[in-house]
Amino acid sequence: MSHTASTPTPEEYSAQQPSTQGTRVEFRGITKVFSNNKSAKTTALDNVTLTVEPGEVIGIIGYSGAGKSTLVRLINGLDSPTSGSLLLNGTDIVGMPESKLRKLRSNIGMIFQQFNLFQSRTAAGNVEYPLEVAKMDKAARKARVQEMLEFVGLGDKGKNYPEQLSGGQKQRVGIARALATNPTLLLADEATSALDPETTHEVLELLRKVNRELGITIVVITHEMEVVRSIADKVAVMESGKVVEYGSVYEVFSNPQTQVAQKFVATALRNTPDQVESEDLLSHEGRLFTIDLTETSGFFAATARAAEQGAFVNIVHGGVTTLQRQSFGKMTVRLTGNTAAIEEFYQTLTKTTTIKEITR
């Protein structure tokens, strides 16, 4: 069977792998306002400015109503901002004609929370669907489908229907389908929310493989900080339509600046006592301090000095985490004994790190 110039052969598709560069995404002063029939207005996005570099994995995190999903709809052209610019590889897509948007969407893969598979199609049939829409030659389609199923670890599941697959396998089919047309941008909207922890870990491992081997830019929308911790290079924290905090995963996890970021980080790290634990700790003798641990915090030297002066240091909570090849942690300690030595311990560490006393 012959192939037209617009229909890549399996060899041509293989030659395109892996992608050498993902899509660059830029939000410039993006605002989105929704109006209902009674003229009431809701600001879903409020002057969002954010850049996602090619090949980067960014986690966009926030509670329900923060504006995360609205961002996704803008990226794939399903909605338009009220004001601002949205650039994909330097091209502003705001106001772009639908014919051009359709072409743009072919370069964007999408995976969903509820998988969105066709129940009447096999796993292979689901992966093949976007290739049919793209009018790819049948032989090339079949080869590409098998290639993608093998890539996601389902090479022997092509003939299975969705009802015969586990949740994790369904999401793998969804990922294979999203990758079928060789996109350079992948949008993952709460892609692991419906999965158990072990399956979530497996799917995140697969997404890391996608980014590592194919060079695809990945935008992960989630309300789970553990997902961001596992996969992202950068994180943007959203609240009430605004990006309230942005930085590397290490920066945000080790030193969250906003209250909402602090709450999210606490759910993933659990290295500070919660209110109930604090109340229990406060029921015992001594002063309680939570201390940020870094290479320059001076914690161990201060502990040794306190012990020499008759203060006893007892570690009651905490942990150390390594992210992006850097370590950080928090330690909660109870000090008893010489009151002057305890105060010196506290004052010394205020000069070298962040130390907070836990009180009622």
UniProtKB/Swiss-Prot annotation:
Alphabetically ordered keywords of this record = Amino-acid transport, ATP-binding, Cell membrane, Membrane, Nucleotide-binding, Translocase, Transport
Localization:
Cell membrane
List the PROSITE patterns hit by this protein, alphabetically. Answer: ABC_TRANSPORTER_1 (PS00211), ABC_TRANSPORTER_2 (PS50893), METN (PS51264)
**What SMART domains does the record point to?**
AAA (SM00382), NIL (SM00930)
The UniProt record lists the ABC transporter domain at: 25-265
Where is ATP annotated to bind? Answer: 62-69
What EC number(s) would the UniProt record show? 7.4.2.11
Q: How does it sit in the membrane?
A: Peripheral membrane protein
Region: Disordered; residue ranges are 1-22
Provide one Gene Ontology cellular component: plasma membrane
- CDD domains noted in UniProt: ABC_MetN_methionine_transporter
Q: What does this protein do?
A: Part of the ABC transporter complex MetNIQ involved in methionine import. Responsible for energy coupling to the transport system.
Known partners and oligomeric status = The complex is composed of two ATP-binding proteins (MetN), two transmembrane proteins (MetI) and a solute-binding protein (MetQ).
Q: What is this protein called?
A: Methionine import ATP-binding protein MetN
